C-alpha cells in the first residue's frame, strides 16, 4: 500500500467518526477529473470553504489522484534521494553549502558545488558518521569543515582575528565531534581529523596509505608546500621543499640532504658536563692569538661602516647596551656580534685546558667576520682583504697542534655568512678565507652555512636576550606564553626592488591589503633601528613573516622564536638546511613553510593561508617553541650558570666534542 493511500484511509476513518452524517466534498479539477468514490456526494460549498479540514481533504484527494499515475517513478526517486543523502556530506563553508559525494570506490570527496575536485583524502575505514547525521553544524559558525585554499582540506576556524570567542567543539550528529585538541600534522589548515569515539586515534597524513587503495597513491607523500619522502635504507622520513629543475640541482640537493643528516649524527642530546669526570677527554684549548686577529678589530668600531658607530654594540661583552625597559638580560645586540660573544664564553668553559697536549678541541679566536665587515664599504683591493686570512693560516701552520691532525680538531667561529668568506676572482665582496685549502678540514661555525660543505655548521644568530640563570629563562617562558597576541601576522623588513627573485614586495602588498590581520614595520625609513620596536611587534604577533633578504637566513627568525612568534619560512635554506644542532628536523613543530615560488607566481595568498590556522594549532606550536626550543636558541651571559637548561653555546660545545670524537 502506498504512503498516500494509507494516509488517505486514515483521514477518511477519522472524519467518519467525527461527522458520521456528513459526506466529504471533492473539488473537481478543470484539467483532469479524478476518479471519485460512489459514496461521495456534493455538499454545501459554504461549509466546504469554512471547514479547514474539508479543504485539506480536497487538496489531499487531488494529490492522491495525481500521484497514482506517478506512484512508481516517485517511489524510485524517493529511494534514490535516500541513497544520495546516505552517501553524501553537506559541508558548510561561510555562506556556501557544498554537497560532497563519497563512496567505497572513491577515496576522495567530490564536492558537487565546489566546481573542482579538491583531493580530500578521507580515511574511510577509520571513522564513519551515521548517514542521517552527516550535516556538519557549528555553534556560531566557528569551527567547520571547509575546503581550504589551493586544495587544502579539513577543519578550520571561520574567524577574523579581532572578534569573538573560540568554541571548544562543534557537534556532528550524536557520536561525531570535532575537537580542537585533535591535530593531524600541523602544517595546513585542514590537517585535522574528527574522532568518532574515545578509542579512535587520529591518523597522521603520511600513514593514510595503510587504509587507502595502494595502487592509486603516489610513492611519496605530497603536502601542499613540500614532499615527505622516505629513506629506503633507514625508513626515516625526509622533507623535500622543492623539485630540482636540472641534474646539477638534483646533485646539489642530494649533497645538502646528505650533509644535513651527517651533521645531525654529531648533535649531543644530553648534558653531562656537570657529572663527575664529564670533562675527561674533552679538553678545549683556546689559542692566545696576536691582538690584530681579534681585539684590535673591535677598536675600529667607529669606522667599521660609514653610517653607524659600532662601539655601543661591543659593550657588555659584545651584548650591546642594556635595554632597561625589557628587564634583566635584555640588550641591543647586533647580528654580527657572535665572534666576541662566543670568545668571552669559551674562556670560562669548565673543560678549558691550558696545556695543548691535554686538549681534544682547539678554538681559534680569529674575528674573521669583523675583518670582512671593516672592508665591506671601502675601496680596497682583494689583496688587502686577504691579509689577515693569509696570516692566520700561516700562524697556525707553525703550530704542532695544527699539523698533528691537519686542523681537523680545530674550530673557527665566524659571525657572518659563509659566502662572505668565499670570494671568487670575479667578485670584490668579502675575503677568500674559506676558499683556502688549509681551511677545508677545520670546523667552521657560522650564522649561515654553505649547504655543500659538511664542515660548515650553522649556529643561531645572537638575539636580544642573554639570561644568566635557569630562573631568568623560566620567568621569560611564563611571561611570553601569557602574553596576549593582538595581531595575527607581522612583517618587519624592507622591499628588495632590485632583486627580481625577492618576494618581499608581494608580501608587503598582501600585508597592507589586510590591515586587520597583518602589521608591517618598514625598515627602509628606520622603523627597525630601535630594537624595542621590533620586539614589541613580534611579541604581539602570532606569525612573523621571514622571507629571504640579502641572503636566505635572518636574525629575525631567532628574534621571533624567543618572543613566541611562529616564523613563516619561504626558503628551506633560511632554516631547515641550516641549523641542524638547534632546530628539529620536523619543521612543522615550530614554523609554517610556504614555497616562495608559489608566492612569486601568486598561487597562494599568505594572509589567507595563515588565517586558516586554528587557535589550537597556534598554541601547540608556541608551547613547543617556548618550552623546547627557546633555551637552546639564546646565548647566555658570559658568567651564566645553567643547571636545568642548555643554551645555544652549551649545545654547540657539547656537539663539537661529539663531532671531534667521531671524526678525528
UniProtKB/Swiss-Prot annotation:
What does gene deletion cause? Lacks acidic xyloglucan and has short root hairs.
Per the record, membrane topology reads: Single-pass type II membrane protein
Its EC number(s):
2.4.1.-
Instruction: List where Basic residues composition bias occurs.
Output: 1-21
An example of a Gene Ontology cellular component annotation for this protein is:
Golgi membrane
Which positions are glycosylated?
126, 158, 175, 181, 355, 379, 522
Topological domain (Lumenal) residues are 93-664
> Where found?
Golgi apparatus membrane
Q: Name one Pfam family in it.
A: Exostosin_GT47
* Functional summary from the UniProt entry: Xyloglucan-specific galacturonosyltransferase that forms the beta-D-galactosyluronic acid-(1->2)-alpha-D-xylosyl linkage. Required for root hair development probably by providing important acidic xyloglucans.
Protein's UniProt name: Xyloglucan-specific galacturonosyltransferase 1
Amino acid at each position: 500500500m502506498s504512503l498516500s493511500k494509507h494516509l488517505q484511509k486514515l483521514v477518511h476513518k477519522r472524519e467518519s467518526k467525527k461527522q458520521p452524517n456528513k459526506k466529504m466534498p471533492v473539488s473537481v479539477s478543470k484539467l483532469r477529473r479524478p476518479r471519485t468514490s460512489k459514496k461521495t456526494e456534493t455538499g454545501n460549498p459554504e461549509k466546504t470553504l469554512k471547514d479547514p479540514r474539508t479543504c485539506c481533504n480536497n487538496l489531499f484527494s487531488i494529490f492522491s489522484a495525481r500521484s497514482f499515475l506517478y506512484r512508481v517513478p516517485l517511489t524510485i526517486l524517493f529511494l534514490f534521494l535516500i541513497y544520495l543523502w546516505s552517501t553524501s556530506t553537506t559541508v558548510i563553508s561561510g555562506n556556501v553549502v557544498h554537497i560532497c559525494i563519497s563512496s567505497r570506490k572513491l577515496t576522495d570527496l567530490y564536492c558537487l558545488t565546489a566546481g573542482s575536485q579538491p583531493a580530500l583524502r578521507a580515511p574511510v575505514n577509520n571513522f564513519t558518521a551515521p548517514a542521517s547525521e552527516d550535516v556538519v553544524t557549528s555553534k556560531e559558525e566557528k569551527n567547520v569543515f571547509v575546503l581550504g585554499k589551493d586544495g587544502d582540506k579539513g577543519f578550520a576556524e571561520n574567524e577574523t582575528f579581532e572578534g569573538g570567542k573560540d568554541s571548544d567543539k562543534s557537534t556532528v550528529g550524536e557520536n561525531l565531534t570535532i575537537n580542537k585538541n585533535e591535530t593531524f600534522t600541523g602544517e595546513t589548515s585542514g590537517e585535522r581529523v574528527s574522532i568518532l569515539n574515545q578509542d579512535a586515534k587520529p591518523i597522521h597524513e603520511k600513514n593514510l596509505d595503510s587504509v587507502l587503495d595502494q595502487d592509486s597513491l603516489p610513492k611519496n607523500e605530497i603536502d601542499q608546500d613540500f614532499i615527505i619522502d622516505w629513506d629506503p635504507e633507514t625508513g626515516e622520513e625526509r622533507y623535500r621543499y622543492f623539485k630540482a629543475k636540472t641534474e646539477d640541482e638534483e646533485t646539489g640537493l642530494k649533497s645538502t640532504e646528505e650533509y644535513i643528516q651527517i651533521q645531525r649524527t654529531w648533535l649531543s642530546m644530553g648534558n653531562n658536563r656537570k657529572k663527575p669526570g664529564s670533562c675527561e677527554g674533552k679538553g678545549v684549548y683556546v689559542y692566545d692569538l696576536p691582538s690584530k686577529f681579534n681585539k684590535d678589530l673591535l677598536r675600529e668600531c667607529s669606522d667599521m661602516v660609514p653610517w653607524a658607530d659600532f662601539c655601543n654594540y661591543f659593550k657588555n661583552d659584545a651584548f650591546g647596551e642594556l635595554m632597561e625597559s625589557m628587564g634583566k638580560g635584555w640588550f641591543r645586540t647586533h647580528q654580527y656580534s657572535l665572534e666576541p660573544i662566543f670568545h668571552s664564553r669559551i674562556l670560562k668553559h669548565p673543560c678549558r685546558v691550558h696545556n695543548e697536549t691535554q686538549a681534544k678541541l682547539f678554538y681559534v679566536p680569529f674575528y674573521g667576520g669583523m675583518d670582512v665587515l671593516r672592508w665591506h664599504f671601502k675601496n680596497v683591493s682583494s689583496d688587502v682583504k686577504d691579509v689577515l686570512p693569509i696570516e692566520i693560516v700561516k700562524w697556525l701552520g707553525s703550530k704542532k697542534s695544527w699539523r698533528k691532525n691537519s686542523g681537523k680538531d680545530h674550530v673557527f667561529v665566524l659571525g657572518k655568512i659563509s659566502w662572505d668568506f668565499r670570494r671568487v676572482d670575479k667578485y670584490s665582496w668579502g675575503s677568500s678565507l674559506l676558499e683556502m685549502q688549509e681551511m677545508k678540514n677545520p670546523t667552521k661555525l657560522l650564522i649561515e652555512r654553505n649547504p655543500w660543505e659538511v664542515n660548515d655548521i650553522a649556529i643561531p644568530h645572537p638575539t636580544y636576550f642573554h639570561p644568566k640563570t635557569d630562573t631568568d629563562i623560566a620567568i621569560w617562558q611564563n611571561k611570553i606564553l601569557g602574553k596576549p597576541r593582538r595581531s595575527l601576522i607581522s612583517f618587519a623588513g624592507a622591499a628588495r626592488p632590485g632583486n627580481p627573485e625577492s618576494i618581499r614586495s608581494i608580501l608587503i602588498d598582501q600585508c597592507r591589503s589586510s590591515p586587520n590581520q597583518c602589521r608591517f614595520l618598514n625598515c627602509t625609513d628606520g622603523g627597525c633601528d630601535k630594537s624595542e620596536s621590533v620586539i614589541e611587534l613580534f611579541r604581539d604577533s602570532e606569525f612573523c613573516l621571514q622571507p629571504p633578504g640579502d641572503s636566505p637566513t635572518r636574525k629575525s627568525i631567532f628574534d621571533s622564536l624567543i618572543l613566541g612568534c611562529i616564523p613563516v619560512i619561504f626558503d628551506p635554506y633560511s632554516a631547515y638546511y641550516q641549523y641542524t644542532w638547534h632546530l628539529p628536523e620536523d619543521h612543522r613543530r615550530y614554523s609554517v613553510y610556504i614555497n616562495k615560488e608559489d608566492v612569486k607566481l601568486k598561487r597562494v595568498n599568505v594572509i589567507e593561508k595563515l588565517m586558516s590556522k586554528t587557535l589550537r594549532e597556534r598554541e601547540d606550536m608556541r608551547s613547543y617553541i617556548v618550552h623546547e626550543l627557546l633555551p637552546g636558541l639564546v646565548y647566555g651571559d658570559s658568567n651564566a650558570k645553567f643547571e636545568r637548561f642548555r643554551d645555544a653555546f652549551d649545545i654547540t660545545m657539547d656537539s663539537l666534542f661529539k663531532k671531534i670524537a667521531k671524526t678525528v
